[in-house]
Amino acid sequence: MRTCIDNRKRKVFNDIKHLSTKAVLLIIFLSLLPALQVMAMETPDETQQKSTIRVQGRVLDEFNQPLPGVSILAVKSTKGVITDIDGNYSIEVAPDEKLEFSYIGYQKNVVLVNGRKDIPIKMEPLTSELKEVTVVGYGTQRKASVIGAITGLPVGKINRSVNKLSNVLAGQMAGVVAVQRSGEPGEGSDFWIRGVSTFGANNRPLVLVDGIERDLNLVDPEDIETFSILKDATATAIYGVRGANGVVLITTRKGKEGSKPVISARAEFSILQPTKMPKMANAQEFMEMYNFAYADNKNGEEFYSPEAMAKYLNGSDPDLYPNINWMDEIYKNSTTSERVNINVTGGSEKVKYYVAGSYYKENGVFRPDKGLGYNPASSSNLDINLFKNTVLNINLSNQYDVKKQPNNNASLWIYTFKTIPIAIPKKYSDGTVARPTIGDNPYNLLNLNGYNELFTNNAQSLIGLTQDFSPWIKGLKANIKFSWDAYNYAHLNRSKNPSTYYATGRNEDGNLMYTKNNDGNDYLVLYKDNKGNRTTYLEASLTYENLFANAHRVGGLFLFNMREKTDNFPDSYIMSLPYRNQGIAGRVTYSYKDRYFIEGNFGYNGSENFAPKKRFGFFPSAAIGYMISNEAFWEPISHIVSVLKFKGSYGIIGNDQIGGNRRFAFNSEMADVNGYTFGTTGGNPISGIGTGYPGNPYVSWEEAKKMNIGVELELYNSLKLNVDYFHERRSGIFIERGAVPSVVGVNVNPYLNLGEMENKGVDASLEYYKTINKDWNISVRGNFTYNRNKKLYDDQPSANYPYKDVIGKPWNQQFGYIALGYFRTESEIQNSPKQIGNPRVGDLKYKDINGDGIVDTDDYVAIGRTAIPEINYGFGANISYKDFDVAFFFQGIGNVTGFIGGETIDMSDTNQLFSNVYQDVALNYWRPDRPNAKYPRLAISGSENNKAPSTHNQVDKSFMRLKSAEIGYTLPKEVCHKMGISLVRFYVSGTNLLTFSKFKLWDPEIDNSQG
């Protein structure tokens, strides 16, 4: 079930140390109101009021979103503060003070106080990109100098209400393909950068948090300072064997120098509902459907008599004639979640700090609450100026996650779907545990079979030291960092197997008569499992950047790193050995007057996955750029076209996570070999020893050759357009040989670096922001990504028919029959190519592609697309008028297909009680009076022909979704001041509110044939 947030209650308050009792009580009262944000206002003492005033306000970005972390400096007194997470600030200054507002990537804003106590600020992006900073691999670069394909997600656009950060990505950034496969609350999304480029073991991007490889979903959205996606070779080659699938870079929040302590708190209550709850056939629909299918097989005889149907429907004897809506009995229509986040940030000349704690709880979707999870977490980021140019950084975090589920959580869903409404009561009226003759009772699975508890703990630490050598060599810095991360997982399963019964009738006294169908036990059986690992990482680097003659800008990076990961609970001796990587990386950049740009990157990396002579690889990239808008001749039209930059890159990147059936594929492994003996012991022959797995001393990493061509355009300092074309050829994909001649004498096929694949496409982003007047502001943004991949080689034997070959087609291309409609007469069946099984009138008819008179797997052809969308897009807007604001965002996917079928579409051939189907199927299956029905004939047996993958049961899973929407109103300042607070904002917001799709049975984003 996809979840959506229909209503949410938030409360934010800052600087609470000076609150009066009255103000505290007021905040507690307001915290019970929905969608309310509150910030407390300090009460200055009497002596301060005589010489100073308290100035406060809110800082917004170009999208009219709150901008946290903005530095506010009182120029005369040098006092400083920073904005909280909702962009609010408060500072006590002289009435004639001058305030300077600054933030990375935005123009400095200097205002005179002139006795004003309320000063709202709108920050504008740098009209020139000369000073804007972008996070790149192992550092930062000036935005103007960046010629790699890098996409950033503004912090204000990150939905802080999500529990898994991966669920934020869909439709938000050009080049990102993200889908949420599971509908279970609390689950994350799968995502790829520019789609899938390999059919090898690892196609997921590298995720780095503060430069350390970590799980994206462990990052609290509240803690994020910057979020960037690195897409092309120039941006990722520096990561060598880890960068082939793209890189996600996240930096976490830090304290600001010159800021007094600011305490921010956020509490949130959310109501979550499924985007689409499946509708199954009710009792009457099922019995009518089953009677038709039964009569079709039994020469007109019906299974349910009119008298029996009446008893099931009128409820006269619910023990023997039950009528249960299992979806309503097992699942709730909605559930809730709660979140609390508190952080403290500040800084002085010596120390800057950011400390945060959070708690998230999500209640279950079952009746009653049988499944829930909670997730307390903490983080801290401390910068200490040991000396004038020496900074020590300490970054600590811990995430603890607990999930509680029914014991049979996986099978509960399908049993709830498939169990027919008239199969069995939840329990018999005398309390006897009920179970059908075949299958199980969903109520028992939820309430009587035990439970699972899953505990996960992630402890992460990072310590770094930065030395600035600029007093001696301008622009030179050194950095060293070390991290230690520990992951621990525990699973406790307490299962129970109760004795169950099935009522067969009533005796003369009217009491139920039972047959015992399961001899169970009344005690809990304990099963437990533990997993864990620890990871260390060491990095040392030198960076340099300087400007010569006000024209030549030169930069460089040289870095060494090493990483080791050890399994705490290995399954074998081989798995107990640490996983190790090490290497060096470098970057050289040059620009002339910010017009012409050249950049080179390299990674020289080693992995112990490979043989000693093949462990290290060199991965270079090069890029050029030309910002024509900085030419002198461009000046006359610079007010129209303010930025125009062309860029191109090419490089080679690696992937050492190649998979295979063994860890050290370069080593041969010996095994017992049947077929010959090596002596005897006690009269019993001893098997000989031979090569079980042949070693491959040439095993190596995958190589990705990437090319990117892009253009950046900005018009009238308000409309930005970025477009990139990309092409990638992946080679050396580690795959099992398709066939090895028997004369070679090996028991298994070896793995070799043989596979090849191509991926290409285009991604683009558009932004527009405009302040129309003092009352109206508008911002619009959108992005689009298209990619298509295809297999070039996979070492499989050539198909017996060219149309069956997977080479030249997308990875995981769907195959099936071409459906020609339904058989309408017996003569049509007799005069058609032989179909699957024994088709009947109303069954599907398939095309005989090869013309041999038989429809079989030789007639499979490529149909539709794949389950991963080729088209991904998103667009939205923020509009504000005075104290009112509206925001919305749409997300969509296209060129994606899937098959429907299985137990929720086709009735069971073996278990009548496990034969329920979707209501849409029950109302739209083929009958003589419905010759053009949506679904083929339903049958209690002999319908194999209708279950094969084909164009008939393949569906278009494209959709467009209203991903988020919010309407807000901010009370006037005068009203707030009378209440003793600085800001009150009422709003209504929601997530996943509307979905537009041709597919109606369930949420089209769910990758499942049954729902």
PLM segments and residue spans:
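Outer-membrane beta-barrel transmembrane domain signature of Gram-negative proteins
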Residues: V179-R181, L320-T345, I424, K496-E599, ...
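Short loop/turn motifs that connect adjacent beta-strands in outer-membrane beta-barrel proteins
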Residues: G255-P261, P274, E349-K350, N389, ...
